[in-house]
């Protein structure tokens, strides 16, 4: 073993196993690309993205940590969301929640 080396178990790793999911159609109505990170509170994303924000409240993208989804101007794509976990408190972002969900 090399110091700092990580040896993963064999087989596939399933991300967010058992988490309930919801799929939304999202359109970028703006004239600039919008990139959303893996742990961003999706309901508070850029106002140029058009989707059902009530459904997205308390949820984040179902993608690996540290990655992002990019929406080009005029693009519509489907995204899968999962609930935020932990204390389920949201602070910052666009300051639309600032507390418990």
Curated annotation (Swiss-Prot):
It is found in: Cytoplasm. It catalyses: urea + 2 H2O + H(+) = hydrogencarbonate + 2 NH4(+). Its EC number is 3.5.1.5. GO terms for cellular component: urease complex. Keywords: Cytoplasm, Hydrolase. Its main location: cytoplasm. Pathway: Nitrogen metabolism; urea degradation; CO(2) and NH(3) from urea (urease route): step 1/1. GO terms for molecular function: urease activity. GO terms for biological process: urea catabolic process. Heterotrimer of UreA (gamma), UreB (beta) and UreC (alpha) subunits. Three heterotrimers associate to form the active enzyme. Belongs to the urease beta subunit family. This is Urease subunit beta. It comes from Rhizobium johnstonii (strain DSM 114642 / LMG 32736 / 3841). The gene is ureB.
């Amino acid at each position: 073993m090399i110091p700092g080396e990580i040896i993963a178990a064999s087989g596939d790793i399933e991300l967010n196993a058992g988490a309930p999911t919801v799929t939304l159609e999202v359109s970028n109505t703006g004239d600039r690309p919008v990139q959303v990170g893996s742990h961003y509170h999706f309901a508070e994303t850029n106002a140029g993205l058009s989707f059902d924000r009530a459904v997205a409240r308390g949820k984040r993208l179902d993608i690996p940590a540290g990655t992002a989804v990019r929406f080009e101007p005029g693009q519509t794509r489907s995204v899968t969301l999962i609930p935020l976990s932990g204390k389920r408190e949201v602070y910052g972002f666009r300051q639309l929640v600032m507390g418990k969900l």
